[in-house]
Amino acid sequence: MKEVIDTVGRRKTSVARVFMTPGKGRVIINKLPVEEYFKDEVRRSKALRPLALTERTEEFDIKVNVQGGGITGQSGAVSLGIARALTEFDETVRPILKTEKLLTRDPRMVERKKFGRKKARKRFQFSKR
């Protein structure tokens, strides 16, 4: 078995590199504890959901470098990275994570703005007269 498992998770424009080692359950994101980095409980629970579902919150030390996007995209990227690392460590957790759709890269991206319009789909106000 490898000592360090490293995986990549992506969501929107965020990229998270996850390094997982056997340990005591510490999660460090960009050199900050997860409680400090994701102050919002919703984003924190989203990021750590794979660990909670597989009941392995105390088994691994996880270091994450995450860049790009906002906090929602980053928490999704971290979640995917952790899920991939867990399956690389132990294939038996794959069905659990797969049923919860945690191993699927969310393909949704921001639609580009089109010329002649205010935003991607919104048009300028139309006046008949």
From Swiss-Prot:
Gene3D superfamilies recorded: 3.30.230.10
Record bears the keyword ATP-binding: no
Any Gene Ontology biological process: translation
Cellular component, GO, one term: cytoplasm
UniProt KW keywords: Ribonucleoprotein, Ribosomal protein
InterPro entries (alphabetical): Ribosomal_Su5_D2-typ_SF, Ribosomal_uS9, Ribosomal_uS9_bac/plastid, Ribosomal_uS9_CS, Ribsml_uS5_D2-typ_fold_subgr
Molecular function GO terms recorded: RNA binding; structural constituent of ribosome
A Pfam family the protein falls into: Ribosomal_S9
PANTHER family in the record: RIBOSOMAL PROTEIN S9, SMALL RIBOSOMAL SUBUNIT PROTEIN US9M
Family label: Belongs to the universal ribosomal protein uS9 family.
Protein name: Small ribosomal subunit protein uS9
Organism in which the protein naturally occurs: Chlorobium limicola (strain DSM 245 / NBRC 103803 / 6330)
